[in-house]
């Protein structure tokens, strides 16, 4: 399936970490998971939204540009509750994260609906194969018992009244109890940790990457914003249906996007569960089927029964970039320490060669 898209698949190593946090009761704490019925396993994933946010953060960092300002609307109800409203983004492609990430603004008294679909289609980061990933559980403790003079203990009785030091001491002696400066956190409140080989996929729509529609039937921009962008150097295509980003800005964003695609990292939810999540291999092509076959897993029944084996394959129509760390997981491969640098340079050349005006 060849289209005017650039397809990127990445293979990453994940070790004892947390991706997305999940809201809910204590039995749904700390990690988003899904069930793989064919292999009867629950596996963790990093949501497409988190991957997208991480890539756009890397792009903004490479550009040394702050992300577009967002207004978070709140409504104070009659009973004193603060209710969430729709966040307002500026809907302005002048910001790289808006141009690449898209926007949506619902109809209001001041404006009509405007919506831009992102030219980046981004998958969740999920296991290369359910048998090549897993979850580990652990409990935790919040411990200050090494310095009891510095840390106090407050005890209240059944009525909620704070007990005096004498009352606490009497209770401890009469009941043969201790009062440690320690809080035990069971594993069902800590949540599982993910490990294994993970993949992500990105499709870059080259037809829409640097163009914004001027169509007012399904508007991406209002007329005032179209006029403002033209004054800032954006040009109309020959048919007048799209605005095209200025060449100088295109070149800067291409460099930053290539960096984001090759060097993005999950930066949230890892204060106690940091994993470098190194990229082991990247596959790049204009054909989605080729990148998914270049980095894949094969089933084998040799030895201990059904197992999955990671495969890195090279063939016509796909460029594969393999780092030395990949040799710890895949046999029979050729790796280079500068492979990701080469991938970044090739992505830059690919994006520069595309035609963005029609």
Located regions from the model:
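Basic polyanion-binding and macromolecular-assembly surfaces
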Residues: 1-45, 56-358
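Short, conserved phosphate/pyrophosphate- and ester-handling motifs at nucleotide-, phospho-/glycolipid
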Residues: 48
């Amino acid at each position: 399936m060849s289209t005017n898209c650039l397809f990127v698949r990445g293979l990453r190593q994940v070790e004892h970490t947390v991706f997305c946090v999940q809201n809910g009761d204590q039995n749904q704490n700390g990690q988003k998971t899904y069930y793989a019925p064919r292999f009867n396993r629950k596996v963790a994933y990093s949501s497409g939204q988190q991957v997208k946010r991480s890539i756009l953060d890397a792009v903004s960092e490479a550009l040394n540009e702050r992300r577009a300002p967002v207004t978070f609307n709140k409504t104070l109800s009659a009973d004193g509750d603060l209710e969430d409203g729709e966040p307002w983004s500026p809907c302005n492609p002048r910001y790289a994260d808006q141009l690449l990430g898209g926007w949506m603004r619902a109809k209001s008294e001041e404006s009509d609906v405007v919506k831009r679909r992102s030219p980046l289609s981004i998958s969740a980061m999920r296991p290369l194969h359910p048998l090549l990933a897993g979850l580990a559980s652990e409990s935790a403790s919040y411990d200050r018992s090494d310095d009891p003079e510095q840390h106090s203990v407050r005890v209240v009785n059944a009525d909620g009244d704070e007990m005096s030091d004498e009352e606490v001491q009497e209770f401890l002696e009469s009941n043969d109890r201790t009062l440690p400066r320690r809080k035990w956190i069971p594993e069902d409140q800590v949540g599982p940790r993910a490990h294994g080989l993970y993949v992500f996929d990105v499709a870059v729509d080259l037809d829409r990457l640097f163009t914004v529609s001027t169509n007012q039937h399904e508007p991406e921009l209002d007329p005032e914003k179209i006029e403002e962008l033209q004054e800032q150097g954006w040009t109309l295509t020959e048919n007048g249906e799209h605005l095209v980003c200025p060449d100088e800005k295109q070149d800067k964003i291409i460099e930053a996007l290539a960096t984001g695609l090759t060097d993005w990292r999950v930066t949230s939810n890892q204060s106690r569960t940091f994993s470098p999540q190194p990229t082991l291999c990247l596959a790049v092509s204009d054909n989605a089927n080729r990148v998914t076959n270049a980095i894949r897993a094969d089933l084998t029944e040799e030895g201990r029964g059904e197992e999955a084996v990671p495969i890195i394959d090279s063939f016509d129509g796909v460029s594969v970039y393999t780092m030395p760390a990949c040799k710890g997981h895949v046999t029979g491969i050729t790796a280079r320490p500068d492979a990701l640098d080469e991938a970044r340079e090739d992505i830059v050349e690919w994006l520069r060669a595309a035609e963005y005006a029609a």
